Amino acid sequence: MSPEAIPDPESMLAEQAHDALDPDLRRSWQELADEVREHQFRYYIRDAPIITDAEFDQLLRRLQALEDEYPELRTPDSPTQLVGGAGFATDFTAAEHLERMLSLDNVFDLEELAAWAARIRTEIGADAQYLCELKIDGVALALVYRDGRLERAATRGDGRTGEDVTLNARTIEDIPERLSGTNEFPLPTVVEVRGEVFFRVADFEDLNAGLVAEGKPPFANPRNSAAGSLRQKNPAVTARRRLRMICHGLGHVESSGGSPFPTLHDAYRALKAWGLPVSDHTAQVTGLDAVTERIAYWGEHRHDVEHEIDGVVVKVDAVALQRRLGATSRAPRWAVAYKYPPEEAQTRLLDIRVNVGRTGRVTPFAYMEPVKVAGSTVGLATLHNASEVKRKGVLIGDTVVIRKAGDVIPEVLGPVVDLRDGSEREFVFPTHCPECGSELAPAKEGDADIRCPNTRSCPAQLRERVFHVAGRGAFDIEGLGYEAATALLQAGVIADEGDLFGLTADDLLRTELFTTKAGELSANGKRLLANLGKAKAQPLWRVLVALSIRHVGPTAARALATEFGSLEAIETASEEQLAGTEGVGPTIAAAVIDWFTVDWHRAIVDKWREAGVRMADERDASIERTLEGLSIVVTGSLAGFSRDEAKEAIIARGGKAAGSVSKKTAYVVAGDAPGSKYDKAIELGVPVLDEDGFRRLLAEGPERDAEDGEPG
């Protein structure tokens, strides 16, 4: 594998080690949040993670700990508040789940498990009855059956909206086209079934053998291959892949008899009776001791099952208790995943090479003799930065210990010094960028990371920046994926992201990717041009995000767009004016000022403006300013509003869509599973509205709300 083929490891752990008293605390939070989002994208969208599950879990925990210590940093679009794949554009049609499809919180040792069980016991006043299930390392899928017939299949996505993969799901042998009810378990009118799509180990090995025989690269592990196979554009490819599925839960159920199942165990019996696949390894137990016994057993027998597992999922069995315990914004409180310790192996370190990420960070990678770990073959691992290479003490030629958490790129723990024979050599970090030849240096004194300063034209940074423009948090352009961004740049069709909105059919015909064998523009090419045209009308905050201004994510972008109304006003504003905007502050203000001082940055704006991209928000005069000056926090899920729609409704009426609750908050709008913001509102005495109250507030303002006596 060449350095160019390495997936960009843009954001790594070392950059985030800031002291809690650092005056740039918000910048530290933003960089850590961006790092987590980057790895979520690589895992959920590209099916090509570059760090281990354990490393990602550590990143997410660091972010959670920072937000717990400084709650004012926590925003609705923080990775700690969202389900895995939230905020990323894909090429599939969106499918809204009938009920939120949440993720799971993880625990990594028996002490953490005991703490979770203690919270359950405190809440319900007794030892709970649990279900212990194998945690399959696959891809979550939701099936909707209406009147017994398969209507739709969708991936988890952001928990509210996933990707419609119905055609592909129909090719999976385990998924029935029609369910059959029984006397004991009659079919509901509508039932949403959740489960995991996976490869059996033997089928995965056969798949890779076939790919190699065809001269194609094999998949790294069963999880990635399952994700890639389920998300194929051609269902015939999925059909050949021998995917399997096991069902492990229910979402929305419409039944004439009300809630049909008192326990999850009963629900699983019903799923099996209807003809759906369920696990033979699920156990119904009572109390923590019985749970730990199941965890210990499967820790010793994890390779005895036909598919890969990376832990045991523990769920409160009684459905009534599940409702009582509720959920956070991203995971149920009544379930937890116990993840087994990563597995380790020894192999030889053949070489260390570097790769350049989107922000210019240069990351060393370990190339190793392929070795079997956790059921798959490993030959590549990240070493993070030059300081980390020295800290680990590894030399090229060493026998090293690698640890694999889940089934992604592993971690090099260190060398086996006793096996050295004197032929080993030290890694010398390059002085120049391997992609563009620029001299490398830290961005500032004391940084652990070395960066390429050629932000304008370094090919690696260009690829990532162009792709960023299409992200769901930016212009949300379907069809402009990583492959398309690379093809456009390599063909010289665009010089940078500034050229995107000026693309024509003739331009796309210069790339093989968008040209048919007959030399005509492909359907994907036509779709890309249409989507670029639609994207020109996106609101100002999305334009700001797309510009890749450091620290400016959706929250800050909305604040700036609301305050200034146009890109020209933002560009000409003083640093003091920018910093005085609620939700912005001095760090972001300085970054905005710095960005607009660069000539080629302003040239991007000029190109977009000339191409017809909307650079100002025009307020709808028909919408009354009923919320002028009010700070409103929305928490939990609302039936009639997406997260963005609720924010935009507040902003359009002159209000501020805040991310955290304080004494300055005028109202908290609490939807389903509101989480800690609701608790904070009660503690501070901030009025709390349900969705109906929110609608009245939008329409009539706070005076009518006070007259109506909305709950507070």
From Swiss-Prot:
Domain BRCT: start-end pairs: 622-711
Binding site for NAD(+): D53, A54, E55, F56, D57, S103, L104, E133, R156, E196, K315, K339
Name used for this protein in its record: DNA ligase
Sequence similarity: Belongs to the NAD-dependent DNA ligase family. LigA subfamily.
Protein's job: DNA ligase that catalyzes the formation of phosphodiester linkages between 5'-phosphoryl and 3'-hydroxyl groups in double-stranded DNA using NAD as a coenzyme and as the energy source for the reaction. It is essential for DNA replication and repair of damaged DNA.
Residues the entry annotates as binding Zn(2+): C433, C436, C452, C458
Gene Ontology MF terms in the entry: DNA ligase (NAD+) activity; metal ion binding
Designated gene of the protein: ligA
